[in-house]
Each structure stands twice: as structure tokens, then as C-alpha cells.
Amino acid sequence: MLIMGVDPGTAITGYGIVEYAGNRFALVECGCIRTMPGVPPAERLQALYGELVEIIKRHRPEHFAVEEIFFNKNTRTALTVGQARGVTVLAAAQSGLPVFEYTPLQVKQAVAGFGRAGKTQVQYMVKTILALPEVPAPDDVADALAVAICHAHHYTWERKLKLK
């Protein structure tokens, strides 16, 4: 199963594409999409959308996973991240991909085994699970890979439970 995980943001959006087969993970590609500061928000969102669609076309993932937004004390930040998240979901939906959403708690639980794990613990586990020489940088990339790993575990277990 080819999964694309995304950690949306207006300035930096992390993405990761992983192959999951036979209870093993393989990294296909990861990186980040950076938009230009000082550019009008609509243009930044349009650039993000275009880059995501190109990545989806290039790799043709079967599933698209994104983290749900948790309540943020900074309303302005929450709104801009929400806009970027909406654009990522739209890019996936218009590309015909099923979209799966996970809470930060679910992602941490699936990757680190503890829902209150710290960022460093999650990053270390992403590195370990994907057998990478170092933690992916920036943080947004590691977070996107964590979402993809989370989806692989959740989706696999849901399918197993339905077969019983």
C-alpha cells in the first residue's frame, strides 16, 4: 500500500510517501513544500495546491493521510493552518484519493506507543521504523511520515477486524 502523509502549513508543508507491505515500511520520498513569505495568502495556497497535485501525479499513492488540527491558542495560526489543511485535502480529493484523518494523539500512539510522546520520541521512532540514517528534517517532514505510518497501522487493523 502506497501512502502519502502530509503535515500542512502555510509556510512549510511536510510530506512523506511510504510503501507498507508485509508489515514492513519503505520510504519512497519525503520533503517539504515551502511557500514564499510576503506573497499574498491566496497565491501561497495556490502554490501549495499545485505542488501537492504534482507529487500525487508523480507517485500515485493509494491513500492520503493528514493530521487533524487540534485547538490552538493562537487563533490566527489555527486559521492559516486550517486553510493549508483544506487545500491539502482538496488536492487529494480532486486527485481521487481517499482521505484519512488522525488526531495528534492517534499519531503519537501509533508511532511511539504512547499518546503523550514528545516530538523527539516520535521523530526517533519515525527514523527507526523507516530505517533511516537520521531523523528527517525539518520537523514537518518527520510529522508527515508519522501520519503515514499511523495510517498504515490503523488501516491494516481496521481491515483485519472487518474480516473477523
UniProtKB/Swiss-Prot annotation:
BP GO terms, sorted: DNA recombination; DNA repair
Cofactor(s) required, per the database record: Mg(2+)
**Physiological role:** The RuvA-RuvB-RuvC complex processes Holliday junction (HJ) DNA during genetic recombination and DNA repair. Endonuclease that resolves HJ intermediates. Cleaves cruciform DNA by making single-stranded nicks across the HJ at symmetrical positions within the homologous arms, yielding a 5'-phosphate and a 3'-hydroxyl group; requires a central core of homology in the junction. The consensus cleavage sequence is 5'-(A/T)TT(C/G)-3'. Cleavage occurs on the 3'-side of the TT dinucleotide at the point of strand exchange.
Gene from which the chain derives: ruvC
This chain belongs to the protein called Crossover junction endodeoxyribonuclease RuvC
Q: Which residues bind Mg(2+) 2?
A: 67
Q: Which PANTHER family match?
A: CROSSOVER JUNCTION ENDODEOXYRIBONUCLEASE RUVC
Q: Which residues form a coiled coil?
A: none
Question: What is the species listed in this Swiss-Prot or TrEMBL entry?
Answer: Pelotomaculum thermopropionicum (strain DSM 13744 / JCM 10971 / SI)
Top-level EC class, please?
A: hydrolase
Its recorded reaction(s) are: Endonucleolytic cleavage at a junction such as a reciprocal single-stranded crossover between two homologous DNA duplexes (Holliday junction)
What Gene Ontology terms describe where this protein resides (cellular component)?
cytoplasm; Holliday junction resolvase complex
Per the record, the similarity remark reads: Belongs to the RuvC family.
Localization in the cell = Cytoplasm
Which residues bind Mg(2+) 1 per the record?
7, 140
Q: Which InterPro entries does the record cross-reference, listed alphabetically? A: RNaseH-like_sf (IPR012337), RNaseH_sf (IPR036397), X-over_junc_endoDNase_Mg_BS (IPR020563), X-over_junc_endoDNase_RuvC (IPR002176)
Superkingdom of origin:
Bacteria
Entry note: cofactor: Binds 2 Mg(2+) ion per subunit.
